[in-house]
C-alpha cells in the first residue's frame, strides 16, 4: 500500500539529513497516516480510510460527504 492520504493525496517529502560535519544526504519525510472509520450520512455506512492527521482535523470541521 502506498504512503498516501486517500483524500488529500499527500505523499512523502524529500529532505536533507544533515550531520554534525554538515554533510547532507537525502532522506524521506513520510506523511503521518492513520487508519480511520468515518460515518457517511449519504451512504448510511462506515467508510474505512487511511488518511493524514491534517485530514482528520479537517473532517472534524466538515463532514465526509463534503469530499465524496
Curated annotation (Swiss-Prot):
One Pfam family cited in the UniProt record for this chain: Ribosomal_L28
GO cellular component, one term: ribosome
Keywords: Chloroplast, Plastid, Ribonucleoprotein, Ribosomal protein
Compartments where found: Plastid, Chloroplast
Plastid as UniProt keyword: yes
One example of a Gene Ontology biological process annotation: translation
Gene Ontology molecular-function annotations: structural constituent of ribosome
InterPro entries attached to this UniProt entry: Ribosomal_bL28 (IPR026569), Ribosomal_bL28/bL31-like_sf (IPR034704), Ribosomal_bL28_bact-type (IPR001383), Ribosomal_bL28_sf (IPR037147)
Similarity-based family: Belongs to the bacterial ribosomal protein bL28 family.
Annotated PANTHER family: 39S RIBOSOMAL PROTEIN L28, MITOCHONDRIAL, LARGE RIBOSOMAL SUBUNIT PROTEIN BL28M
Protein name from the UniProt record: Large ribosomal subunit protein bL28c
Gene: rpl28
Amino acid at each position: 500500500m502506498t504512503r498516501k492520504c486517500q483524500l488529500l493525496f499527500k505523499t512523502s517529502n524529500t529532505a536533507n539529513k544533515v550531520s554534525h560535519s554538515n554533510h547532507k544526504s537525502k532522506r524521506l519525510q513520510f506523511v503521518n497516516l492513520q487508519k480511520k472509520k468515518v460515518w457517511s450520512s449519504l451512504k448510511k455506512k462506515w467508510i474505512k480510510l487511511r488518511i493524514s492527521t491534517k485530514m482528520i482535523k479537517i473532517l472534524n470541521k466538515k463532514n465526509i460527504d463534503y469530499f465524496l
